[in-house]
C-alpha cells in the first residue's frame, strides 16, 4: 500500500478526510438540526474517531468546518441566537468501555497534577451522562430570564418559552440562607422518561398520528417547537448537572458534588444516581454499578461522567482545545449498531404467534454478538418497511430481545427498472416487501389473524411441533415448574423424536426412554460420544433429569397456573388467582364475570382464563398432569377478601351487559338481590331501571344461554361464601411491612424467599430506603446491606426471616 493511501479506504488522506467531514457534518445536521438521525451514535463515534486520528497524523488537513473543532449543531434560524457567556463545551468520550477506561482517566489526571504513586487518591464526582438535550438556564436576581440550547457551544438558541413549560424547572430560585446569587447559569439536560414516551406514543396511535422514534429525539423536538403550547403537550423532564456563569454567590461550594447539593437546595432536580468516589477503583465500581442497573432506570443514559471533584483542581487542570482535562464521559457497549438483513423468516411461539425475525450479518451490540432481531409482527414490518439487503439499526438493551429499530433507506439496494435508460433513469428497490406466510412453516397449518389482533397465529395447536416445544420450555422454566436440567436440546429431541406429545408425557418418561432418545439423536446427528466409543453407556445425566422431573411434581399453585401458559396470564396474575380463589378446582370453574372482579384482571384476561379452562383439550391436558402425579401445593379456602367482590352489584357490573354501568348495577341489586332471581327476571321487576337499560338487560338474558350461566355463577358464589373463613378480610402477618432481599441465602432461592414473604403480606422491594422495615441478607450482600446499616434498618439472616414468619410483630405466640 502506498504511504499516501489511507488504510480505511485505500484513498489518499486528503480525500478520506474530506469524505469523513462531509459524512459527519451530514449526520450532525440530521441529529442536531432535523432531530432525525439516520445512524446510531456508535456509527457517528466510529467515523469521528477515524477523522480525529487522521487529522492528528496530518494537521494540515484540519479545516474550519471540521466537526473535530465543533461541539454541536447549527442554530435554527427560527429562534433568536444566544451567545453563551461561558462556552458550553463538550467533554471527551472514553472509547474503552471496560474498567480500563476509568483507570486510564485517573492515571491521566494524576500525571497532569504531578502526583506520585504514594500520594492520596484523587476524589471524583461520578454521575450519569443523560441522553437528551443540553440546556443553559440563566437566572438573574433569582428569576429565570433565559433558556438556551447548547448550539455550537458558543452560540445557542433562545428556547425560554418552551422551557418554561417544564414543571421541574423552577421559574424562581429558592433562597438559601435568605439569599440567591445575582447571576446563576444552571446547565442540565432536558429528557423524556421511557414511560412518558410510551404513553405519548399510545396517544399518537389513538389519534392516528405518526409515532416518535425514541425519547431523545422527541425531547429535542419538543424544546425546538415554535409553538410553546405544542411543547407543553410533551411530557418533558429535567436534571441539572453543572454551572455556567455565576456571580454574587456568597458561600459558593468548592467541590462539584457540593455544587450539585446547592442546586438541589435552590430547587433544581438533580439525579440521585451520583457519588463522590476515591481514585480509579472508585470510578470502576461506579461504572459497574450503573451498568448493572441502567436498563432498569426510568430514562435513557449515554454512559457515565467522571469529574475531578475539587473546583480548584479543575481550574489547575484546565482545558485542551475543546475539552476539559478534568472530566471524561465513559460509555458502555453500544446498544445500537448498523448491520445488514440477510433474510427474513418467522418463529412460531407457544401460543402459535407467528413472529417475523430478521437474520442479520453478525454485529456486536449491547455486549454480545447479535445474529437475529425481532420484527414483532406483520404490521410492524410494513410500518418500518424492512426488506432483505437493507442496512438497519439494531438495538439490544440488557436481556431484551434485539429488535430492528429503523431502516437506513439511503443504503437500500436498488436496481434499474426494465426499460429505463440514460435519459430516463428509473430505479426500484432490489427486494420486494416482506409477506407473512399463509401456512405455518413448521406444520403447514393455516396462519390466521383474528380481527383486532396484531399477531397472526398458526392454527395447528399442539399438533404443531414448534408450539409443543415452546409450551414445554415455558412449562419447565425456572419460575414455572423449575425442572432442573431440562434444557432446550433435550426438549427439541423429545418432541422431534416423538417421545413427548403433551406436557404430561414428561412425567411418564423412563430411564430407558432417555437413553434411547440420546442414542437416536446421536445417530441422526452423526455423533459418537466418547463413552459409547469406549463401550460404555453414560446414565447419570438421564438419572438427574428424571430426578428433576420428579421434584417438579409439587409446585406452589401460583407457579403451576403460570406454567400452564394461559394467554395474558403472567406471574402476577397467576399469583392473584391462587391467593384469591385458593384452589385449582375453583380456578378451573371460575367464569369470566367472577374473574373480572379480581384485582388487576381486566375483561381480556378474564375471558382468556375462562376460555382456556373451558377448552376440552386443555381440560384433558390438565387432567393428564394430575393423573401423572402433579399436585399443586399451598391450596387454601377462598380468601375472605373475595367476600366484597361477590356482592351482587359487583357481579352484575362484571357481566358485560350493554348500558349496565356500575351505578345501574347497584340500582339493579336493590331490585333483584340475587343472581338466581336475575336469571328468571321479567319486565315488571325492572321497572325501577331506565327503559333502555332494562331492554338491554332483557335482550342480553335471552342471548347465548345467559340465564343458565347466571344460575351456575350463583351456585359457585354460594359455594365460595360457604368455604371462605368467617369474619372480615384477613391480612397477612407482615401486611404493611416492606422487606428487601440481598445476597445469597443458605437454603432458599431468592424467588422462594420472596414468595414466602409475599404470602405473609409483605411488600418485597428492590431498594433500601427509610421506609424499609427489614433487610434479609445472605452471602455477598453488598451495598444494600451497607445502606440498611447506615439507615438503621433491622437486618435479618435466613433463620431470622423464618423466625419472623413464624412469630410476626405483635404475635403473642
Swiss-Prot record:
One of its GO terms (molecular function) is DNA binding. GO terms for biological process: DNA repair; DNA replication. Its cofactor is Mg(2+); Mn(2+). Its EC number is 6.5.1.2. Zn(2+) binds at residues 440, 443, 458, 464. PROSITE patterns: BRCT (PS50172), DNA_LIGASE_N1 (PS01055), DNA_LIGASE_N2 (PS01056). It is an enzyme of class 6 (ligase). It catalyses: NAD(+) + (deoxyribonucleotide)n-3'-hydroxyl + 5'-phospho-(deoxyribonucleotide)m = (deoxyribonucleotide)n+m + AMP + beta-nicotinamide D-nucleotide. Residues 729-813 form the BRCT domain. InterPro entries: BRCT_dom, BRCT_dom_sf, DisA/LigA_HHH, DNA_ligase, DNA_ligase_AS, DNA_ligase_CS, DNAligase_adenylation, DNAligase_N. NAD(+) binds at residues 41-45, 90-91, 127, 150, 189, 307, 331. Pfam families: BRCT, DNA_ligase_aden, DNA_ligase_OB, DNA_ligase_ZBD, HHH_2. One of its GO terms (cellular component) is cytosol. Keywords: DNA damage, DNA repair, DNA replication, Ligase, Magnesium, Manganese, Metal-binding, NAD, Zinc. The active site is at residue 129. The keyword Metal-binding applies. HAMAP family: DNA_ligase_A (MF_01588). DNA ligase that catalyzes the formation of phosphodiester linkages between 5'-phosphoryl and 3'-hydroxyl groups in double-stranded DNA using NAD as a coenzyme and as the energy source for the reaction. It is essential for DNA replication and repair of damaged DNA. Belongs to the NAD-dependent DNA ligase family. LigA subfamily. NCBIfam families: dnlj, PRK07956.1. This is DNA ligase. The lineage of its organism: Bacteria, Pseudomonadati, Pseudomonadota, Betaproteobacteria, Burkholderiales. The gene is ligA.
